[in-house]
């Protein structure tokens, strides 16, 4: 994990004003800030992966093999999104660089300076650009909120490449700005990652509804508070339909 990125996000979220925290509710991510300090319990993590049945996507436990599965209605409040809102969908399209420019009102040179391989944005310069609040400039504050949401999505909910943000997240930020619900995508990717972990694949990651976590090696426990409790597949965006 990039310690500079982690530190920058920590400072940014600490600096949010009361109004900005309230405005995060529009995107359905308010609890993400609240859960920043959660420390992963590795024993619990390993235990619930052993209880997961990847065939039917449920936890099985007890002598009677009771079943429990993550429910959309229970999952959305954890993230903070409205389960009755229209679902955020992944838009398969070309021109994601243009989406990045438009989302943050960057010039082409500005955007290009932050983009790697035409596919992902380096998050540190994006944080540097928007981490300073400008309360007297509403347009700038709106772009700052978009940047924060983009970084939270890239570094927490879809953290397959810590320190970078997939450009395919840009259309999702716009849908969330219109109060779309991200819970369906996050739940689907959580289940897929649980499946991969239970089947023994090593390319699954953990993250805490907040800051990014590195790829997990179950044989090397860590108490890093920037890791966390929701399991996400390493490259979730590849499977959106």
Question: Which residue ranges define each predicted feature?
Answer:
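Extended, charge-rich alpha-helical regions
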Residues: 115-132, 136, 140, 211-241
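Extended alpha-helical, oligomerization-prone segments that build pores/tubes and scaffolds
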Residues: 202-204, 214
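N-terminal leader regions that mediate targeting or early regulatory function
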Residues: 1-201
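Compositionally biased, low-complexity segments enriched in small residues
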Residues: 2-5, 9, 205, 222, ...
């Amino acid at each position: 994990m990039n310690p500079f990125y982690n530190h920058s996000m920590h400072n940014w979220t600490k600096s949010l004003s009361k109004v900005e925290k309230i405005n995060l509710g529009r995107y359905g991510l308010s609890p993400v800030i609240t859960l920043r300090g959660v420390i992963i319990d590795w024993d619990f993590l390993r235990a619930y992966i052993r209880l997961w049945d990847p065939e039917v996507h449920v936890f099985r436990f007890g002598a009677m093999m009771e079943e429990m599965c993550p429910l959309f209605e229970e999952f959305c409040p954890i993230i903070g999104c409205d389960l009755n809102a229209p679902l955020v969908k992944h838009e398969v399209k070309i021109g994601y660089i243009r989406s990045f420019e438009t989302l943050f009102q960057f010039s082409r040179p500005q955007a290009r300076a932050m983009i790697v391989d035409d596919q992902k944005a380096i998050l540190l310069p994006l944080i540097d650009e928007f981490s300073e609040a400008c309360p007297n400039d509403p347009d700038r504050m709106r772009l700052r909120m978009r940047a924060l949401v983009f970084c939270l999505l890239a570094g927490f909910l879809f953290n397959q490449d810590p320190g970078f943000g997939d450009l395919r997240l840009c259309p999702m930020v716009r849908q969330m700005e219109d109060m779309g619900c991200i819970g369906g995508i996050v739940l689907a990717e959580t289940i897929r990652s649980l499946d991969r972990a239970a089947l023994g694949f090593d390319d699954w990651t953990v993250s805490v509804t907040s800051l990014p976590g590195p790829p997990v090696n179950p044989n090397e426990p860590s108490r890093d508070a920037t890791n966390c409790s929701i399991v996400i597949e390493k490259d979730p965006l590849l499977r959106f339909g």
